[in-house]
Swiss-Prot record:
Contains an atypical KH domain with amino acid changes at critical sites, suggesting that it may not bind RNA. This is Oocyte-expressed protein. Its main location: cytoplasm. It comes from the Eukaryota. The lineage of its organism: Eukaryota, Metazoa, Chordata, Craniata, Vertebrata. The gene is OOEP.
């Protein structure tokens, strides 16, 4: 008999420690890949999606890390969105299903949000560099821009 400290469970042909199985069981489930079409979405608009790509960190910032905001965006804009990670993991593929005019509007909104998040991140990095510079006491070559005569 195995004591609790050395407890293990058999999964198929593998032995896994019980603590990793517990951790796996407590992890949140990924969202289901198959969804039913909402009653308000016309079937004919599923034929021609508008597809574009964004960096994965931008998709996390826009849609949330668990993509929880997607249903709200779909309801408010009357489109269907799919956000899938591309092979490398650095990019996500965003597909927008709906009327062409609405597809373009939603794409424009999402790209505007992406631009805002990029600028916000760049500003945060500059602020961090400035803080580091000020912490070091501002040592370095300092030449006045306008020398006083």
């Amino acid at each position: 008999m195995v004591d609790d400290a050395g407890a293990a469970e058999v999964l198929g042909d593998e032995w896994r420690p019980a603590w990793s199985l517990d951790r796996l069981l407590r992890a949140p489930l990924p969202p289901p890949r198959i969804r039913t079409r909402p009653w308000w979405f016309p079937v004919q608009e599923l034929r021609d999606p508008l597809v574009f790509y964004l960096e994965a960190w931008l998709a996390d910032a826009i849609f949330g890390p668990d993509r929880a905001i997607i249903p709200e965006i779909e309801w408010m804009s009357q489109v269907l969105l799919t956000v899938d990670v591309v092979n490398s993991g650095d990019l996500v593929e965003i597909s927008i299903f709906g009327w062409p005019r609405v597809q373009n509007r939603v794409k424009s909104v999402l790209l505007s949000l992406a631009s805002w998040h990029r600028k916000h991140r760049a500003r945060a990095e500059k602020m961090k560099q400035l803080e580091e510079f000020l912490k070091t006491g501002g040592t370095g070559p300092q030449t006045p821009e306008h020398p006083v005569a």
